[in-house]
A protein has these predicted regions:
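Conserved acidic carboxylate
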Residues: 9
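Charged docking surfaces used in two-component/phosphorelay signaling
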Residues: 16-24
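Short hydrophobic/Thr-rich beta-strand motif most characteristic of the beta2 strand and flanking loop
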Residues: 26-34, 41-42, 103
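Active-site beta3 strand of CheY-like receiver
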Residues: 45-51, 56
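The feature encodes the CheY-like receiver
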Residues: 57, 66, 75, 87
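C-terminal output helix
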Residues: 107-116
C-alpha cells in the first residue's frame, strides 16, 4: 500500500521541495496551500501523515492541528509541524496543540526524511 502524505505549505518553493523529496520515496501526495482547505483535504484524502506549515493564510497551522486531533476520525494521523519560527516556546506550544513531530526551517532532506520515518514507524535510513 502506498503511503499517503498531505503537504500543507503556502510557499511554492517549499511545496516543490517537499514534493520532490516525497516523490522519490514513491509516496502518494496531496498539496494544499491554504489553511481554509486543509480539513476538507484531510477528510477527502485520508493521509497517513500530514506535514503542516504553521503560518498559513486564513487559518493557522496550530489551530488546524488542534482541530485534526480533536476529531476521532483523524486524531491518529501523525502531524509533522514545520515552521520558520523556531523558538523553544513555539515548539512547546505546537506540540501541546497535538503535533507528533517538529522541524524548524531551513531543514535538510535528511532531517525531513528521518522525522518522517520516525512518525511512520519506518526504519531511519
Amino acid at each position: 500500500m502506498t503511503t499517503k502524505v498531505l503537504i500543507v505549505e503556502d510557499d511554492l518553493l517549499n511545496r516543490m521541495f517537499y514534493e520532490a523529496v516525497f516523490n522519490q520515496r514513491g509516496y502518494e501526495l496531496m498539496l494544499v496551500d491554504d489553511g481554509a482547505r486543509v480539513l476538507d483535504a484531510v477528510g477527502d484524502f485520508a493521509p497517513d501523515l500530514i506535514t503542516m506549515d504553521i503560518h498559513l493564510p486564513h487559518v493557522s497551522g496550530r489551530k488546524l492541528i488542534r482541530e485534526i486531533k480533536r476529531n476521532p476520525e483523524t486524531a491518529q494521523i501523525p502531524i509533522l509541524a514545520i515552521t520558520a519560527y523556531a523558538g523553544k516556546r513555539d515548539e512547546e506550544g505546537i506540540r501541546r496543540a497535538g503535533a507528533s513531530g517538529y522541524l524548524a526551517k531551513p531543514l535538510s532532506i535528511d532531517q525531513l526524511l528521518d522525522e518522517v520515518d520516525t512518525l511512520l514507524g519506518e526504519p531511519v535510513h
